[in-house]
Amino acid sequence: MAWADICAFEDLVENSGICALLNGQQVAVFLLAPSDEPQVYAVGNYDPLGNANVLSRGILGSIGEQIVVASPLYKQHFSLTTGQCLEQPDVVIPVYRVKLQQGRVWLNAGQQNQQASAA
Amino acid sequence: MQQTKQILVIGNGMVGHHFVEQLRAKDPLVQITVLCGEAQLAYDRVHLSGYFSGTSAEQLALTTEEAYKASGIQYRLNCWVEQINREQQLVVTSHGGQFYYDELVFATGSYAFVPPIPGNDQPHCLVYRTLQDLDAIAQSAALSKVGVVIGGGLLGLEAANALKQLGLQTHVVEFAPQLMAVQLDQAGGQMLSQKITELGVQVHTGKATQAIVAGAECRYQLKFADGECLEADLVLFSAGIRPYDQLARSCGLAVGERGGIVVNDQCQTSDPHIYAIGECALWQQKIFGLVAPGYQMARVVVSQLTAGGLSFSGADMSTKLKLLGVEVGSIGDAHARTPGALSYVFTDPRAQVYKKMVVSKDGKRLLGAVLVGDTSNYDSLLQYALNDMLLPKQPEQLILPATSGAPLAALTLPNSATICSCHNVAKSDIVAAMDGGSCDLAGIKSCTKASTGCGGCTALLKSVVDDELKSRGVEVKNHLCEHFAYSRQELLHLVQVGGIKTFAELLSRHGQGLGCDICKPTVGSILASSWNDYVLKKPHVGLQDTNDTFLANMQKDGSYSVVPRIAGGEITAEKLLVIGQVALDFNLYTKITGGQRIDLFGARLEQLPAIWQRLVDAGFETGHAYGKSLRTVKSCVGSTWCRYGVQDSVGQAIAIENRYKGLRAPHKIKMAVSGCTRECAEAQSKDIGIIATENGWNLYVCGNGGMRPRHADLFATDLDTDTLIRYIDRILMLYIRTADRLQRTSVWMEKLDGGLDYLRKVIIDDELGLAAELENQMAALVNTYACEWKATLDDPQALKRFRQFVNSPDADENIVFVEERAQIRPATAEEKRQWQQQIPVTEIAVKALAEEN
């Protein structure tokens, strides 16, 4: 799968999310910056429980060891590493591979978690 | 499967209709035929008097002929049954029609009893039972000035209300020495008489009407047994009901001595193929004249005809209602007839409130209650009675006015109490989830779905869970979440004492993990009310809920609504035009809010800055509709225009709104100012309510509407403006400093040890010596206020966030609108599938954006 150049690193918002368009798919990209080592995560922007493209506007955090985003609509938590909804484990959103290179943010259109449904 | 059965229903009142509806829902195939004696299908008889205050017959209707047809329900109107042949299972109507049945259901209801008084059959002597009766009453009323209702029971008072609404001078005549003798005790009946008399209805109790003869001044004269008389043009009988059981008698079914078709626990009559439900049925020598037991019987019969299982076991006849505007409630043994029963009575002659509680001999159980003038205790009393709950040690607290602050005691809620109405989760479901091993909020939410709908029950749910944990001996920590082992109040102290300015600093010094959607917005609010930094400053951005981040209210489809501040609800014509033009240009849906301002819906994320640029240029500021902060200060028009106003309520509201706008708090804050005691601004339903007096202002505190409405308490009277503002400063600042997350002022005050009195001591008497400090803190916040939208528009970095995609100018294709009542609304999922191709709103919006730039 090909990598796509999405935006400059500066376009990310610290401890929050932005949304990118990748081959017609909406992808939420989060920058977690608790330490010197910035961590970037990418998941589908569509909240399958609220049925709207809003996850990039959710609040980041951790529940136990899981790094999560809370949907701004009904507050369910989705894991940023597995895409699984903590409240309804049968609901899984796509997780995308993401890398930082030369000050740019790259996304890979191939989903990382195969179990996520395309819908 | 058996062959499809023929079910025949006689009568289409509320109960008959409920039966048909329930049966069809359970069995889509069964043949249902309804024979309805009236000219229209079922309508709401409970709210019949609304017919005279503007409710149309269509609005009262419970169904339509189309709906019956669509569900395959056969029906005949104006159809009276002549005869029933039980052997052949055949019903013959007066038109000669014949209907075969497998099972027959009597839902014939009842008719108004007309006492055998000579002269009761004259043209303007009427009854109050059906829509046709109502038409006759209206016709007669047009030719009458004075009306009298014979019968002072529940229905009689309803009828009196109808006559009053028709503009007649209204009398009520009751044979018993008091009104509503079935439901109320004597003192309660007296209080009700007094209140109703003040509302302009003359009450005559202990009067036996002996004859209705021609009158001297009016059409008729009622002659009473005691020699007195009363003149009236219209006589309305409402002296009770009698079951329609003639048909059952004539076909040989068992009926009671005083009427009513005898049924067993399955609502079966003496013929196993014939059932009777509602007011025509007699169960254990009792007739149930309320709609709820009738519905229960309907469901019992539906269960008999389908899966089986349900049986009728009597019904609670407790009632709560508003008669002629007076609240009345009656529960269980209202007359204290249980041997050994004890009564507690509270009377407030000034407010005209009467409350009585009947308790068992040992004082442990509630047997009954009477409430007149204030039924706010009805629900909790009813729960005590129905669930046979153990009363508190001092049961009188339950009916005494809540001066000491009756706590929201979740533990005392019965298990059947509904906590989350969106997902219909009862307290018992939550307890079961905890029995099943869930012992934290998140777990309980995920397995019961409670609080995952509108979220309005979040605080109540937490309270239930905490209390339940406490009762199980689990130590409940008031910790905000897993990241901070502190309450909100403790965190606020840590922030202020430590001079902590960012979430990261607080987390590293006092917390663990990364934070979450609970602690981040809470800390954001604490930081804002401590230092009043711009909420979108870089370190604070990630703390805010989306509404605070984008300074707008997210709607279900991910679009936003925009609410400019309209302080006190006062707005110039020019500004109205601006709002209208903005709405037109961006194709927004407009709606007037309850807080006297205008909400603009359907703005997409990337449109918000352009919309606000226009609004800010025209002099608008953000309305903070998105924040846990001051929302609005509602006002009535006040002494400037109103004949009754005694102070300038609008001016006061505007000054107060401008003083506290932007103030971040544990929850939203609403206020109102009324210009006189008529209270048109509804200030007593607000966190801070102000009502003008001849001498100044009365201050009410800690009220709210919403899910658990609470009247505000009178805090101080006849204040001058300066004192008024100082008290509000102190109260709000104390609330911000000590309340829990998402705790409204009402719950906060109720949970304060000592309640309202304690609050008075701190605020008015300054017993803690805090007053000056609280005022200074408020002054600092007021002085550093800045409109967040103006600040955002001036900040290119902040503006960058207002785009759907970081790498594309496209709009979110999932936001699609359709037109309804000449405005947009979000398309349903089905509509989106159908019209995926046309997205007209996007084009309009893009055009508007292009013009802006």
Spans of model-derived segments:
Chain A
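N-terminal pre-ligand scaffold of iron-sulfur
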Residues: 1-66, 79-80, 92-119
